[in-house]
Amino acid sequence: MAVMLALLALSMLIFPAVTMDAAAQACRLFAGSVLPGLFPYMVVSSMLLRRMKPPLPALLILLMGWGGGSPAGAKLIHAAGGLPSRQKSRLLIACSALSPMFFLGTLAKWLASPVCGGIALFSVLTSGCLAAAFAGKGLSTLPAKQENHRSLSLQEAVESSARTMLLVCGMTVFFRVCAALLIPPFPQGRGVILPVMEVTAAVEYVCQLPLPPGWKTALVSGVAGFGGCSLMMQNRSLCP
């Protein structure tokens, strides 16, 4: 691991233009596509969740997680508390899709079709539910942990959500830079490197391909359903 980190740091120093350009692109994409839809919902949903009496129904947590998408869903699931480990894991899998506002807003604009954005959203949510149903059979069950459950003020909710958004931005920038440094040695692997590393950059790349809308929608659904390292690490950080 130390060798890999040293090589990564050296690559950043040798290719500063690539590093800075990738980081700038990630920040622009985050500010224009992720932050506007995710931050306001995260503030409101966190305040709402903490004003409900636990234990909360799993269906309610699932619906709220779907509304925010990933990683807001992971934060809500962790904040809910009182969930057995198996149920918690299944909810995390089912809520691993990106925000509906990303699909119906940003993605629909990139594909020039709200219908395609809706189809992609439905596909990702359905596949997440199926994966959660099958994955839950092999998960061990641990007793629920009772969390400290008190109401959040607006100031606390905004502060907590802002810290979360900083984490999301940081992960997005880091993995976008990693992808940018890997692509020049393996130019033919761009279509694999981006989905593995950073999902929003991969979705943007797919939308720019000279393909029919149906193919783009199918590819975007697969890429968004997988999530990539950036989204996985965000979820792991917010719901350990």
Model-inferred region functions:
Residues L5-V18, A23-L35, F39, L121-F186:
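Selected transmembrane alpha-helices and immediately adjacent juxtamembrane segments
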Residues A6-A9, A26, F30, V43, ...:
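Hydrophobic alpha-helical transmembrane segments of multi-pass small-molecule transporters/permeases
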Residues A6-L7, S33-Y41, L98-P100, V196-T200:
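Small-residue-rich segments of transmembrane alpha-helices in multi-pass membrane proteins
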Residues L13-A24, M47-P54, G105-V115, C178-P187, ...:
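Transmembrane helix-loop junctions in multi-pass membrane proteins
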Residues L38-L60:
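Juxtamembrane transmembrane-helix boundary signature
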Residues Y41-M42, S89-E147, T172, R176, ...:
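Alpha-helical transmembrane segments of multi-pass small-molecule/ion transporters
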Residues L56-L111, I193-L209, W215-C239:
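Alpha-helical membrane segments and immediately flanking helix-loop junctions
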Residues L154, V158-A224:
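Transmembrane helical segments that form the transport core of multi-pass membrane transport proteins
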